Regions:
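Hydrophobic pocket/interface hotspot
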Residues: 29, 39, 63-65, 81, ...
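Generic C-terminal helix-cap and adjacent flexible tail
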Residues: 158-167
Length: 167
């Protein structure tokens, strides 16, 4: 069963807040945000796939990946990790790039703060996304970000539920 996803948009602050609780330990959810082979399993909303090109998960490191569509179309992105607090939070900047990793002008960029909190139900994930302007946020939402990110989080939930031991 899919748990609820909170998805709040604040036009005045050009921010989006996302929250979801997973029936899994913080360590397990953390791994699915920080290990390339696990990210590739859920980051892209089906029928798209995520393909990691490079990953260096450390402060000032980065993750370059391609979203690969059903017709093999490819869209590239880069995540630069700013601050990382093990099993607690990740601060990162996300940009659209060309195949070589160069930022695409005119495309929205996002600053993310991802939080992982142990709760009775498992792990509460919070994601705060900050945009430079309302126009950038509106453009991102117009590209289907809300539906795509929600589908990805539900795919992650399916994966985590399959790993949970049956009692």
């Amino acid at each position: 069963m899919e748990t609820t996803i909170t998805f709040n948009i604040d036009d005045k602050a050009a921010t989006i807040f996302v929250m979801k609780t997973f029936d899994a330990e913080v360590e397990e959810v953390w791994k699915h945000f920080t290990e390339a082979d696990l990210l590739d399993q859920w980051w892209a909303p089906k029928p798209w796939k995520c393909e990691t090109l490079e990953m260096d998960f450390q402060p000032q490191g980065f993750w370059r990946y391609a979203m690969v569509g059903p017709e093999n179309e490819r869209h590239y992105s880069k995540v630069t990790f700013n601050d990382i607090t093990f099993h607690r939070s990740i601060s990162q900047r996300c940009t659209f790039t060309d195949e070589s990793g160069n930022e695409k002008p005119g495309m929205p960029a996002e600053n993310w703060l991802i939080g992982f909190t142990g709760v009775q139900e498992g792990t509460k994930l919070t994601v705060n996304l900050h945009y430079h302007s309302l126009e950038e946020m509106t453009k991102m939402l117009g590209m289907g970000f809300e539906g795509g990110f929600k589908r990805g989080l539900n795919q992650l939930e399916e994966i985590l539920n399959k790993k949970r031991p049956v009692l």
